[in-house]
């Protein structure tokens, strides 16, 4: 059986006893200001050094090199952070389940995180148009907006959450909507 503390301990011994949150940030292909996006998120995260910050690699879209370079530089000077190149599916879901929150702009914040009742701080416009749940807190690119959404997510009471991507006949419903 998977144990997230054992997994974190394998990554870094300090992680097994600490609270943590996950960072999943990908390039915004519509907007070209990925450098400012990652800079503002990382600047905002400096206020949360009492948490372990677990970063994942960005996807391979144009602009991912900028994001990855900034994350690696951040990690060099922030000993409470770790970068994981690739999670296994089960490991990712277990880590997400016990994470204080997920921050970034990943679709995982709209699909898996609500299902696991993990709050999401969604930064920017990459996920614009997706249905929101009670556990998703949008933030603009501004540091003040990001910090405000982090504070809200840390005070989020895990409870029953509306799940937008589950239910009976989901495939038929999606197909019906796509046909219209």
Where does each model-flagged region fall?
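Nucleotide-activated sugar donor-binding and catalytic core shared by glycosyltransferases
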Residues: 1-180
């Amino acid at each position: 059986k998977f144990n997230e503390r054992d997994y974190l301990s394998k990554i870094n011994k300090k992680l097994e006893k600490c609270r943590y949150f996950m960072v999943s940030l990908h390039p915004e292909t519509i907007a070209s200001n990925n450098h400012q996006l990652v800079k503002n998120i990382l600047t905002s995260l400096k206020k949360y050094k009492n948490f372990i910050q677990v970063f994942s690699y960005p996807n391979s879209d144009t602009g991912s090199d900028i994001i990855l370079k900034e994350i690696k530089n951040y990690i060099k000077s922030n000993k409470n952070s770790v970068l994981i190149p690739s999670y296994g599916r089960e490991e990712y879901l277990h880590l997400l389940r016990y994470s204080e929150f997920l921050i970034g702009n990943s679709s995982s914040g709209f699909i898996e995180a609500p299902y696991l009742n993990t709050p999401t701080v969604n930064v920017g416009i990459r996920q614009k148009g997706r249905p929101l749940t009670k556990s998703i807190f949008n933030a603009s690119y501004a540091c003040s907006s990001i910090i405000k959404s982090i504070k809200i997510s840390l005070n989020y009471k895990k409870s029953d959450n509306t799940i937008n991507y589950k239910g009976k006949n989901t495939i038929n419903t999606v197909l019906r909507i796509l046909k219209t």
